[in-house]
Swiss-Prot record:
Membrane topology note: Single-pass membrane protein
One Gene Ontology term of the molecular function aspect: transporter inhibitor activity
Illness: Cardiomyopathy, dilated, 1P: A disorder characterized by ventricular dilation and impaired systolic function, resulting in congestive heart failure and arrhythmia. Patients are at risk of premature death.
Gene: PLN
GO aspect biological process, one term: regulation of cytosolic calcium ion concentration
Bilayer-spanning residue ranges: 32-52
Lineage: Eukaryota, Metazoa, Chordata, Craniata, Vertebrata
Listed name of the protein: Phospholamban
Residue numbers bearing the N-acetylmethionine modification: M1
Short name of one Pfam family: Phospholamban
Lipid-bearing positions (S-palmitoyl cysteine): C36
Subunit structure: Homopentamer. Can also form heterooligomers with other sarcoplasmic/endoplasmic reticulum calcium ATPase (SERCA) regulators ARLN, ERLN, SLN and STRIT1/DWORF. Monomer. Interacts with HAX1. Interacts as a monomer with ATP2A2; the interaction decreases ATP2A2 Ca(2+) affinity. Interacts with VMP1; VMP1 competes with PLN and SLN to prevent them from forming an inhibitory complex with ATP2A2. Interacts with S100A1 in a Ca(2+)-dependent manner.
Length: 52
């Protein structure tokens, strides 16, 4: 889990150093947020299935 956090942090740092048009950055941010939400939902579903 810590490695994943480290990887995402370094990826975010790398992405922020690259100059990007504002619109592209906004789209990327939205994609990233959606991806995180989907991951959280999948984790919740897995936990619920394990508990049942």
């Amino acid at each position: 889990m810590e490695k994943v956090q480290y990887l995402t942090r370094s990826a975010i740092r790398r992405a922020s150093t690259i100059e990007m048009p504002q619109q592209a950055r906004q789209k990327l941010q939205n994609l990233f947020i959606n991806f995180c939400l989907i991951l959280i939902c999948l984790l919740l579903i897995c936990i619920i299935v394990m508990l049942l």
